[in-house]
């Protein structure tokens, strides 16, 4: 499903990632690693947001050769989302609905689900960190992607919102969608079944263990 080959990424003289191959099938995957280990860099590479050396393919679609088609299959929620502070939540919401040709009812249902509907007409600059995170998750789930990349999805949100996120991930996974998650916190095994855990160690992606089940 997802294949990365001959990946090399550095910032200036600082090498962050350097590995030959990493492949995963459909499923839910958790990526561990400390600050600066390369988790966010890896996610930005896969989502086509930064330049890199190597090849990335999703279901046979090559990021370099078919960038628009490739990106249309991926949703990415950053660890620390940064949006223009002067726009309203609804304006960002509408942008994602339009660009992803999504059903407005689906997007509105997501806003209700994460209890953000009353705040959608407020400017993003007035949002708390938790509200901002929930907005980014709503935007990530708008539309119908094949791969959802959620970088630190549990930070700044309360336990009730985390529970809702777990449920949504499981619902999407049951529809054949895949997830790449990263978290400094332990993913609760009684909340979410994870097919494989990986860790970035010395610029390499190393499998830790598999089948963290309910």
Please place each PLM-identified region on the residue numbering.
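Hydrophobic anchor residue at the start of the ABC signature
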Residues: 137
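Conserved ABC ATPase "signature" region
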Residues: 104-120, 141
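Walker B catalytic motif
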Residues: 152-153
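Conserved structural motif at the start of ABC-family nucleotide-binding domains
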Residues: 2, 16-19
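Helix-to-loop junction immediately C-terminal to a conserved catalytic motif
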Residues: 46-47
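Conserved ABC transporter NBD signature motif
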Residues: 51-70
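Q-loop/switch helix immediately C-terminal to the Walker
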Residues: 80, 85-101
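A short, proline-enriched helix->beta-strand linker immediately N-terminal to the Walker B motif
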Residues: 142-146
